[in-house]
Amino acid sequence: MAIERTFSIIKPDAVAKNHIGAIYNRFESAGLKIIASKMVQLSKEQAEGFYAEHSARPFFGALVSFMTSGPVMVQVLEGENAVLANREIMGATNPAEAARGTLRADYAASIDENAVHGSDAVESAAREIAYFFSADEVCPRTR
């Protein structure tokens, strides 16, 4: 199996409800290592840049507004098949459709406030990691 890196955001709704520790526990319990992490308050420009691929979609304005409504936790996760592993931990985008025991089933209120973001591919993970972290902020864990 391939050791990969993926990018994750704990969104403003989950941060406001103090779910950071519980979500980190889920990552680590699934064998993912947190190799970079920080809390940030996204500016409108940062949110628009990060979600630029959705700029033509009708929900874009609401997404940017939500993502700038409070601080978020951004983190880099590393582990075997990390992209897929994190997506399985997160569950379906719509929490009403998310499998029981997934982050979105347990911590999300709606499809709009769905607690977490995770990269959908190794390539997007690399781009998203670089958007928030410099190379010297990522600390591989070899033990």
From Swiss-Prot:
| Subcellular localization, as worded in the UniProt entry | Cytoplasm
| Active site (record annotation) | H117 (pros-phosphohistidine intermediate)
Q: Which domain of life is it from?
A: Bacteria
Against CDD domains, the record matches this protein to: NDPk_I
Look up the EC number in the record and give it: 2.7.4.6
Q: Which family does it belong to?
A: Belongs to the NDK family.
Q: Which HAMAP family match?
A: NDP_kinase
User: Per its record, how is this protein called by name?
Assistant: Nucleoside diphosphate kinase
